[in-house]
Amino acid sequence: MTFELLATDGKARRGRLTFPRGVVETPAFMPVGTYGTVKGMLPRDIEAIGAQIILGNTFHLWLRPGTEVIRRHGDLHDFMQWHGPILTDSGGFQVFSLGALRKIREEGVYFASPVDGAKVFMGPEESMRVQRDLGSDVVMIFDECTPYPADEEVARRSMELSLRWAGRSKIAHEGNPAALFGIVQGGMHEDLRLRSLDGLEEIGFDGLAIGGLSVGEPKEEMIRVLDFLPPRLPADKPRYLMGVGKPEDLVEGVRRGIDMFDCVMPTRNARNGHLFVDSGVLKIRNAVHRHDESPLDPACDCHTCKHFSRAYLHHLDKCGEMLGSMLNTIHNLRHYQRLMTGLREAIQQGKLAAFVDTFYARRGLPVPPLT
């Protein structure tokens, strides 16, 4: 993987990631394909909405169907028939989400499989092996996601454990041509975030992610970390904000120098009838749309908006038809990709401030301050 920084506008960055399997223009949003599928989307649909890279879930694919099944097809790209780049998370966040079902030790994490209840172990070496078997283009280190809230002592112990696991991940990754990203932890504590960053830079990674956000903290806390941390990340490496978020969060992340994002929100919200439009959120199951012949968003060029009315999408939602979720997902993911395209063009032209002003004006919201 190579990363080129092509333009800046304030803290915002316009870049390009180049992989053997394709080019990713940044800032970029990665649709989430947890089980080897972006829910409701054929691979050709993912390509059609403009996605250049997707995210796969190491933890879930390891448990089911298992890497031995996937490897018989070649790798995850062959298994799911997506031939662009894939970033795989390490499984650390999913283990974190198990709560009382897992026990964290120095060697790794012991837990009961959510698939069949079997006792399972995953550590840095296992995570790196699974991601190698998946043929990931970007591999994430195995880490512990610091919970929120966490006092300084809890956050410190978690961060230091993640640093030790980062070193083991780097060693276990040797010989794998894929890019390896470190993950900055430390909770909401700036001094711990800096210590994590220093430790990761000493180990050496191809890119750095910000973890431990979007885990229940107030929006103000997330923004505080994003005001503080990205300017301190190395300028010559991609910066990835994990698990975030709403369109507004993407805009605020880009304004602060983030290059890569992922989140289940556009696909999950699509299945619940919450659709993103330039003016905000449209709830398609509301009765007001029953006779509405207009498209979801006249400004959108997705297949859904070009061919179907709000009334039809409302009807599908009320009937529980799977086509409704599919069309909604196409629209939401295209909305996110259109947003990223607009951000890239604005940075390239030195017009990000005007883009941000228009973005918030359409939503009837004030522009948040940028420190």
Curated annotation (Swiss-Prot):
The gene is tgt. SUPFAM superfamilies: tRNA-guanine transglycosylase (SSF51713). Gene3D superfamilies: Queuine tRNA-ribosyltransferase-like (3.20.20.105). HAMAP family: Q_tRNA_Tgt. It catalyses: 7-aminomethyl-7-carbaguanine + guanosine(34) in tRNA = 7-aminomethyl-7-carbaguanosine(34) in tRNA + guanine. The active site is at 89 (proton acceptor), 262 (nucleophile). Its EC number is 2.4.2.29. This is Queuine tRNA-ribosyltransferase. Belongs to the queuine tRNA-ribosyltransferase family. Substrate binds at residues 89-93, 143, 185, 212. The keyword Transmembrane does not apply. Catalyzes the base-exchange of a guanine (G) residue with the queuine precursor 7-aminomethyl-7-deazaguanine (PreQ1) at position 34 (anticodon wobble position) in tRNAs with GU(N) anticodons (tRNA-Asp, -Asn, -His and -Tyr). Catalysis occurs through a double-displacement mechanism. The nucleophile active site attacks the C1' of nucleotide 34 to detach the guanine base from the RNA, forming a covalent enzyme-RNA intermediate. The proton acceptor active site deprotonates the incoming PreQ1, allowing a nucleophilic attack on the C1' of the ribose to form the product. GO terms for molecular function: metal ion binding; tRNA-guanosine(34) queuine transglycosylase activity. Homodimer. Within each dimer, one monomer is responsible for RNA recognition and catalysis, while the other monomer binds to the replacement base PreQ1. Keywords: Glycosyltransferase, Metal-binding, Queuosine biosynthesis, Transferase, tRNA processing, Zinc. Pfam families: TGT. GO terms for biological process: queuosine biosynthetic process; tRNA wobble guanine modification; tRNA-guanine transglycosylation. It is an enzyme of class 2 (transferase). Pathway: tRNA modification; tRNA-queuosine biosynthesis. One of its GO terms (cellular component) is cytosol. Its cofactor is Zn(2+). Binds 1 zinc ion per subunit. InterPro entries: ArchSynthase1/Queuine_TRR, TGT, TGT-like_sf, tRNA_ribo_trans-like. Residues 243-249, 267-271 are annotated as: RNA binding. Zn(2+) binds at residues 300, 302, 305, 331.
